[in-house]
């Protein structure tokens, strides 16, 4: 197996609005998440969130404590949320073992223990997407499925944004330190998410897009309300959203995305909305 990581530094909005396409993609887009028998991570300075993925194919992959953590184990001072977006898989955390099927999630609390990822079938490997944030205390591990989620049906087909927001690793379902994760599924014929757009200056966010055909693409919108920029993305890619930025998208096909947040509070409704007509 191989572990890869890179560090992404935070950007000031006054600086970011002058970035060209190459710089925007370099600083905010995470293109390489799933590579066979690799664990790939981005250590972000936005609330020190780690965004990554593991794709075990015939091997057991270990979640290694990367150097920026300066810790004996990855979870020594961190909590983690994991979603399986591939075939059936297994996550082991210390003496605990969790089986995760497609679109099932797992919360891991902080503590000194080894974490491993494996697939049940190498021909249909699991794909583990994860977000991790610093944690001030330990909360119990827990597997969460859509049956456990707080579900909000939003939008309409006429507005091209009919979707179900599955709040899964949130404080309405289980205790966490600062991590909040969920999964939004867009209905056929709907392509817009998070519109009208909003920001939440108390929390940063990361979006991971999947369930989009290979010959289609997603256009993610970011930036300040009066200085928006776009990032064209493919499936199985993620994007960082600073606390000062909107985070919205439209695509050429319906899709699903996983959102993860961390920061000052755990209030999902703490959002500052903008009028669609104010966007520039």
Regions inferred by a protein language model and the residue ranges of each:
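Conserved metal-binding segment of the jelly-roll/cupin
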Residues: 100-120, 232-253, 260-262
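Acidic, low-complexity central loop/insert segments
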Residues: 86-134
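A short glycine-rich, His/Asp/Glu-containing loop-to-beta-strand
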Residues: 36-69, 162-205
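Hydrophobic, proline/glycine-rich low-complexity stretches
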Residues: 1-71, 75, 79-83, 278-279
